[in-house]
Amino acid sequence: MVSVGFLKSMFNVSGMVADLKSSNFSIYGQWISYLNIIFCLAFGIANIFHFSAVIVFSIIAIVQGLIILFIEVPFLLKICPLSDNFIGFVSKFDTNLRRALFYLVMCAIQWCSIIVQSTSLIVVAVGLSITATVYALGAAAGQEFKNSAILSDRGRVAASVTNEAVVRDML
């Protein structure tokens, strides 16, 4: 049985409450993006067993899920050994407008999967469409991009980021 104290230690509850009160669309976009990571990976794997061209869209969904993971959880860029080109690519998505356009392209790719066959990849397309819309609303409202406090660890993450070289040497 999982205790409430354990769950509170795993998630930054005070950060979640602060995020809800912020009324910032970029934070809501990040929350939906966390779901999109799960959707892309789960439905990508589930649809890879089709014997049609849907396999291509399944593989694309899995890759999209991994790219979203690195875009929405920037701490992973610090601890995973990645190429400078990939880090530069991911770092470009630092505004609401750029993220909205990125998600718009990704959802358009997944909507094209319907041409081949209607599958559960529609869930991925809908999720990416919602994320693109939320980020576009943030850009239209002129809101500054902010990172969510859900995954932060009350200051410990900031201390870890300063010791980036130590983490990379350990890996």
UniProtKB/Swiss-Prot annotation:
Q: Which residues cross the membrane?
A: 25-45, 51-71, 96-115, 120-142
Q: Listed GO cellular component terms?
A: Golgi membrane
Q: Which InterPro entries match?
A: TVP18/Ca-channel_flower
Where does this polypeptide localize?
Golgi apparatus membrane
The record's listing under Pfam families reads: Cg6151-P (PF10233)
Where is it predominantly found?
Golgi
Membrane topology per record: Multi-pass membrane protein
Q: Name the SMART domains on file.
A: Cg6151-P
Q: An example of a Gene Ontology BP annotation on this entry?
A: vesicle-mediated transport
Keyword list (alphabetical) reads: Glycoprotein, Golgi apparatus, Membrane, Transmembrane, Transmembrane helix
Tell me the first and last residues of the signal peptide. Answer: none
Q: In terms of domain of life, where is this protein from?
A: Eukaryota
Which family is it part of?
Belongs to the TVP18 family.
Summary of the function given for this chain in its UniProt record = Golgi membrane protein involved in vesicular trafficking.
Q: What is this protein called?
A: Golgi apparatus membrane protein TVP18
Q: Can you name the source organism?
A: Kluyveromyces lactis (strain ATCC 8585 / CBS 2359 / DSM 70799 / NBRC 1267 / NRRL Y-1140 / WM37)
Lineage of source species: Eukaryota, Fungi, Dikarya, Ascomycota, Saccharomycotina
